Amino acid sequence: MKKRYKVTALFEDGTSQCLVVGNFSSPTNAWCAAMRNLTPEGIARVQHYNVEEISK
């Protein structure tokens, strides 16, 4: 069953960005989708990811 997830990235300069909100079968799939939305330079700046399930 697919669930709704939000993936937020915290960057080294203290800013954050919501990368993906959507229906995925697992938190790992949501994280992978978020990675595809960043450039290699953006990926290098990420300090932390937060993947959270969104209630309906």
Curated annotation (Swiss-Prot):
Gene assigned in the entry: 59
Protein name: Putative gene 59 protein
